């Protein structure tokens, strides 16, 4: 197995650069959605969370490349990213006051006791889904020095163009000497929303992206559904089964 060489961080502008969607997550706590009157708002994103936690927990120099919308929700997202200490490279979109483009929205009821957690989305006309090849000046971004580049399967599932952008960014990262990682993060709801062939297309799309990565992250479901690898039935064992 080849040794993974992480570039020295002395002169690098970013220890990690993430590419993905920024979303607002509405959380009613332990109250079911149908009974909740209030929700806590969190700024999140499968790829962004890596950058935010490295910055907040370890003081690392991180950044996010994403889409932002010029309306109050977008301003709230900007503030949260800034407060986390994450630098941002934004493609800016203007909201038309009615239809968008919008910042994606995730609803997450954490469940309680025997009631399982529930997650669903409102990602209609999402700004991040409009991103594609050419959206970012990778030469300028990586020119400042980036040690590690990261993206994920949630962003890849948003549109036909986001996987192409991920591949473009990975190639630029590799050319700049950065380590490249990809979190498969298979989400059946997102791929199914792409149409009846969505789940089948996931393996082809994620497989092509995975070929560009030095590090692949995922669990059994990600590997089977996201890459089409053979394995035991995903639902065949309890989540608590140590085997």
Place the predicted regions along the sequence by residue.
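Short pre-catalytic strand/loop immediately N-terminal to key active-site residues, enriched for Gly-Thr
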Residues: 35-44
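A short helix->loop->beta-strand "cap" motif at the edges of active sites that frequently abuts
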Residues: 175-179
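Alpha-helix C-terminal capping segments
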Residues: 42, 49-61, 83
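Conserved N-terminal subdomain of the carbohydrate kinase-like
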Residues: 61-153
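Conserved phosphate/ATP/ADP-binding segment of small-molecule kinases
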Residues: 189-243
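Hydrophobic faces of well-ordered beta-strands that scaffold small-molecule active sites
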Residues: 64, 180-182, 216
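Positively charged, low-complexity intrinsically disordered leader regions
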Residues: 1-33
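Short, well-ordered alpha-helix to beta-strand connector turns
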Residues: 13, 145-146, 213
